[in-house]
Amino acid sequence: MTDFRDQERYDAHQEAMRNSRRAKQRSSARSQQRRRRMIAVSILLLPVAIAAFAFTWSRSSPPPKPAKPLPTTTTPNQSAAEQAVGGRIAMPDHVRGVHVTSYAAASPALFEPIMALADPKVGMNAIQIDVKDERGEIAFSTPIPLGKESGAHQDVYEPVKVLRRAHAAGLYTIARVVVFQDGYAPQADPSIALRTTSGALWKNDLGITWLDPTNEKAWDYPIQVAQYAAELGFDEIMFDYVRYPTDGDASTIAFADPGRPRQDTITAFLKKASATLKPQGVHVSAAFFGLAATDDLGIGQWPGKLRNTLDAVYPMIYPSHFTDGQFGIDKPGDTPGPTIAAAMSDWRRKTNGGSMQIRPWLQDFTLGGINYGTREVREQISAADRTGAGGWLLWNAQCVYSPGVFNGTSGQP
C-alpha cells in the first residue's frame, strides 16, 4: 500500500524548487538593472535635488495620516503573534477550502488565484497551508533547536504575512504538519529515527527517513512544530502522515517498541498532541487514509478511538484511489458522486456518537480513468454535503483548482 501523494508531492516540490530558483535569478538580474539605472538617474538629478532642498528647507509638511488598520478579532489574552495576524477565525460549521503548498503560498502566480476564491458566506472559507511537509521541510524559521540543527528550515514564505492576508479575507487557516515521515530530523538525531535491524536509518521507497512512531521521544518534535504554528496564529493544526510506513521494505524495520499495538500508538500520539495544543486555543485534526473506516489497514489509524479527541478528521477518499469493485461500484474513479457517498457512509458509522467532524479530502486532479474537472469535483462536493460532512478540502498537488467549484457551496445538501 503506497501513499500516492509521496511521488506526486515530490514531483510538485521539485518543480516548485526549480521555479523558485528561476524566479530568484530573474529577480536578482532585475534588481541589478534597477540599481544601475537608479545610480545613473541619481547622478543626473543631484543638482536639481540640491536646488529644491534649498527652496523648501524651511517649509514644513503635515504628518502623514496613519494607515487604516485591518479589522481584527483580537482579545487581551491573545499573543502578540496572534494579534499581528488579525486574531483567530472561529471554526466554521462547514469548512470549504483547498490545499496550499509552502511554495504556492510564496508564489503570487499561484496564491492570488486561490485568494480570489475567498467568500466565507457561500464559497471558500478555509485554506490549508503546509508548515512541515512530507520531506520534513519546515516552511519558515522556528526557535525549535532540532529544526535548526537538522537544516529543516527553508524560509519559503513569511507566515505572519500569509496569515494576516488570509484572516483579513475571513479565511479559517489550517496548518498541515507531517508527523513521522521526515527527511531531516532523523539524520540530525538518530536516537528518534526509525532504524533497520542492522542499525542503519530506515528509508522508504523514495529514500526518505522516518521518525519512529513507537518512540515517544520522537513525538516531541512534530508537536513542537505544531505548537509554534499555533503560537503564530493558525486556527487549526492538521497532522498528516500520522501512521506507520506503507511503502519501503517493512521487513527490515526495527521499532523501538515492536510489541506496542499500532492503533494504540497512533491514538496515544494524537491524544497527547491534542491535550498539548488545545490550551493554546487551536483546533486539532488529522488526515487519514480513505479506507481507515472500512478496514484495519495495519498502519495504526483507527478513527473510532478518536471520535471525542480530535475536532475533525480528513479522510482521503479520492475516487480514483479505490480499486474496481470497492463499495460494490464497478469503477469508483469514474463514478465520483456515489463513491464519495459510500465512503462517507463507512466514516459516519465508524465515528458515530462522537464530536469529531468528518471533512473529506476531495479529488481535483486526474489520475487514470476519466478527466476530473469542475463537474466531477462538484459531484463529490454534493455527495459529501448530502451525507453529512462537516466540510471538505480539495486536493491538487500543483495548487491549481478547477474553475467554479466553489460557486454557491454553502454546505446545504
Predicted regions and their residues:
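Aromatic-lined carbohydrate-recognition surfaces of secreted/lumenal glycan-active proteins
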Residues: 99, 172-182, 238-239, 245, ...
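Glycine-rich, aromatic-flanked loop segments that form ligand/cofactor-binding clefts
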Residues: 126-128, 157-202, 238
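Aromatic- and acidic-residue-enriched segments that line the glycan-binding/catalytic groove
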Residues: 140-150, 182-204, 247-258
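Active-site-adjacent "subsite" loops/lids of carbohydrate-active enzymes
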Residues: 86-105, 180-228
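Substrate-binding cleft of secreted/luminal carbohydrate-active enzymes
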Residues: 310-324, 332-413
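Catalytic domains of carbohydrate-active enzymes, especially glycoside hydrolases
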Residues: 111-137, 230-237, 308-312, 384-392
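N-terminal targeting leaders characterized by basic, low-complexity, disordered sequences
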Residues: 1-30
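Conserved, mostly hydrophobic/aromatic
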Residues: 127, 166, 173, 222, ...
